[in-house]
């Protein structure tokens, strides 16, 4: 019994075609068998577009506020604006610190100067010094100071020492230095001496006229 060769060839071809099965994976056709897959130009174009889309989707994000930009140039300008704002803020903080330090120093130095001025410019001291200086300059006779000056000039040492102690206490009370009180005493004593000499001359003149 003879076999038709055509029939055997067709059976082989049908069995071969049935053994070659195509499998699709992620849009690509994979052929199981000895045959290699044929990649078309369309598939190559789609793969290239996928790679380019990945590069385009790269993010340009600001490190200060997290805002996204399309390109690096826009991102750089935005970050420069952030840097300028931060520098301006630091300058304002430094100016505020300098102002607070200056205010602190002026408030702590002012009480020292005012206390020094108050010590030598109290109303009692001004009245005390002006009263005696004006009396000496205008020639007004003051019994209290004339009696003390006579005691200083003609009294004993104990009286002078007591008066010096009293004047020292008065100076401490009114903020007057001892040398200023001594100067005022000298002025009062000289004025009293001149008054006593003038009165003596007047008495002698009247006595001569009467004789």
From Swiss-Prot:
Keywords in alphabetical order, please. Cytokinin signaling pathway, Developmental protein, Differentiation, Ethylene signaling pathway, Gibberellin signaling pathway, Metal-binding, Nucleus, Transcription, Transcription regulation, Zinc, Zinc-finger
Q: Which domain of life is it from?
A: Eukaryota
Q: What name goes with this protein? A: Zinc finger protein 5
The subcellular location is:
Nucleus
What does UniProt list as this organism's lineage?
Eukaryota, Viridiplantae, Streptophyta, Embryophyta, Tracheophyta
Which chain segments does UniProt annotate as zinc-finger regions (C2H2-type)?
60-82
Q: Which GO terms describe its molecular function?
A: DNA-binding transcription factor activity; transcription cis-regulatory region binding; zinc ion binding
The UniProt disruption phenotype note reads: Reduced trichome production on sepals, cauline leaves, paraclades and main inflorescence stems. Reduced number and size of root hairs, due to reduced growth rate.
Question: Which tissues is this protein detected in according to the database?
Answer: Highly expressed in roots, young leaves, developing stems, branches, inflorescence meristems, floral meristems and siliques. Expressed at low levels in rosette and cauline leaves.
- Does the record bear Transmembrane in its keywords? no
